[in-house]
Amino acid sequence: MHPGVLAAFLFLSWTHCRALPLPSGGDEDDLSEEDLQFAERYLRSYYHPTNLAGILKENAASSMTERLREMQSFFGLEVTGKLDDNTLDVMKKPRCGVPDVGEYNVFPRTLKWSKMNLTYRIVNYTPDMTHSEVEKAFKKAFKVWSDVTPLNFTRLHDGIADIMISFGIKEHGDFYPFDGPSGLLAHAFPPGPNYGGDAHFDDDETWTSSSKGYNLFLVAAHEFGHSLGLDHSKDPGALMFPIYTYTGKSHFMLPDDDVQGIQSLYGPGDEDPNPKHPKTPDKCDPSLSLDAITSLRGETMIFKDRFFWRLHPQQVDAELFLTKSFWPELPNRIDAAYEHPSHDLIFIFRGRKFWALNGYDILEGYPKKISELGLPKEVKKISAAVHFEDTGKTLLFSGNQVWRYDDTNHIMDKDYPRLIEEDFPGIGDKVDAVYEKNGYIYFFNGPIQFEYSIWSNRIVRVMPANSILWC
């Protein structure tokens, strides 16, 4: 992420803007006129917004196609310049109101604050939470940034503070109205006078301190990053990524991308209480190992840490997402996964539990214990799993052993477990991830993958693990 000069976001008056055609991809009948209008408003709002006179800066992209390509590039989507379902899905996710691309001058602003001791004031409160819960969320959000910089934040109870925090709905006094429930959640202004540093939260949202509604701490920590001078990040694992994702109840750790950004502005603090900040995996890292792989409705999902790559057929560039951005109720990290295509289900394993999912939805009654599959109670986790649709059998790997589960009769096959080395000689005594395709099983062990022929029962090729990601 490159910290830069932010300007206050502009929510435009569309009736004064000259409409430009928005190209769509595939079957245009799949996209409604409402979707096309929504996409155009989105692009005008977040990619080279106009100034108050409705005039684009001369060096800004002026066509909808160019803006759409920028948006697809920003979010790591296939860059086609055409509106498709995947692009529209990203556009419809709840997000911050600050633009992703576009530099424009409305209010005077600076790159960063010229002082390290900043003040903030909570002007009003949301009715969704107690005053104490709101104050705790904001204090915790500021601490995210003060932990890694020399910045100090002091709360004022009256008067004018550097960062004025308020809740409002629709038009709330800054000419940049909110849009009702979901969609645009909040916005903040960059360092500077007047509105500089101020953060506004849409009170049409349901604010909480949990996974329900929108977590106020997470949104506030993001907005305060803008208040301090940070732009949006293209890194889907960064706090400053524009799309909201609930990241779990465990102790929050500021991702490395955000640490690098804020420290480039203010320098490091004296002592970082959490020196190990999570990094986003690099798909072309030669030492990359993978956690799990599964197909899902014709696509391939490749899991690593709290992320997964989504690989479409006939597409080279894999799209990277946080796992919780698709399945908020799943753990951040998973151990294994497999698809049961005829039932339109995927099964996800983490520790002693497993989940059954239909698309985005977790089936009722899950998670269940892996011991319910017939595994002995001493098995603490499944490290890899692969399903064979023609036989209805699923291989489950744990440690140096493999079990075979009968998905049709819901029992574990006899004569199992077996040693991995005996059934699949040459691949090693453990499996990190596995999938099957066209009569071959692909075993992943550390940074290496083995292409194993089912017919000849032998290894036919050894490749880097990340070759599945076209590296």
Swiss-Prot record:
Residues where Ca(2+) 1 binds: D128, D203, E205
Hemopexin repeat copies, ranges: 281-330, 331-377, 379-427, 428-471
Disease in which the protein is involved: Spondyloepimetaphyseal dysplasia, Missouri type: A bone disease characterized by moderate to severe metaphyseal changes, mild epiphyseal involvement, rhizomelic shortening of the lower limbs with bowing of the femora and/or tibiae, coxa vara, genu varum and pear-shaped vertebrae in childhood. Epimetaphyseal changes improve with age. Metaphyseal anadysplasia 1: A bone development disorder characterized by skeletal anomalies that resolve spontaneously with age. Clinical characteristics are evident from the first months of life and include slight shortness of stature and a mild varus deformity of the legs. Patients attain a normal stature in adolescence and show improvement or complete resolution of varus deformity of the legs and rhizomelic micromelia.
Chain's gene name: MMP13
Region of interest (Disordered), ranges: 263-284
Record carries keyword Protein biosynthesis: no
Species of provenance: Homo sapiens
A single GO cellular-component term on record: extracellular matrix
The name this protein goes by in its record: Collagenase 3
